[in-house]
């Protein structure tokens, strides 16, 4: 794709790839996730970091949203992104203000921070701050 050519031609530029590399309504949301796997090929460039939003970004909001996460089935996008980028190139982003109408800011934050996927070692620390600090040139 043209974007991958841009990544190839700009190795000194840091890229923050938004929304788990998903675009609303695209085939990346449908099993077997071939479109998403193709988008994750951007991870081969070490100057890329993926921003991960709350689950409300990829799941339909229930009619009445309680505190916590009411979703039973969550597509494997977070796991696939972690396998491709590793936690040191993943950073949480609230997607505020749209998250307020989806899962709410608190759920967008805690849903990623407390995800079992990020409970090993300092994975959550990387996703919730260290990766962003490193990407933007702060000491980690």
Language model features by range: what are they?
Residues 55-57, 96-99:
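Short Gly/Pro-enriched loop/turn and capping motifs at secondary-structure junctions
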Residues 19, 50, 95, 124, ...:
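Divalent metal-coordination and catalytic microenvironments
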Residues 1-91:
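Catalytic pocket-lining loop regions of alpha/beta-barrel enzymes
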């Amino acid at each position: 794709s043209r974007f991958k050519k841009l990544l190839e031609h700009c190795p000194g530029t840091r890229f923050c790839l938004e929304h788990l590399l998903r675009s609303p309504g695209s085939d990346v949301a449908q099993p077997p996730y071939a479109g998403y796997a193709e988008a994750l090929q951007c991870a081969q460039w070490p100057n890329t970091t993926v921003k991960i939003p709350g689950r409300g970004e990829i799941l339909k909001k229930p009619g009445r949203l309680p505190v916590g996460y009411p979703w039973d089935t969550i597509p494997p996008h977070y796991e696939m992104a972690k396998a491709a980028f590793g936690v040191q190139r993943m950073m949480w982003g609230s997607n505020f203000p749209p998250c307020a109408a989806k899962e709410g800011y608190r759920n967008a934050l805690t849903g990623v921070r407390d995800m079992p996927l990020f409970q090993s070692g300092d994975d959550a620390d990387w996703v919730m701050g260290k990766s962003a600090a490193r990407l933007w040139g702060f000491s980690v």
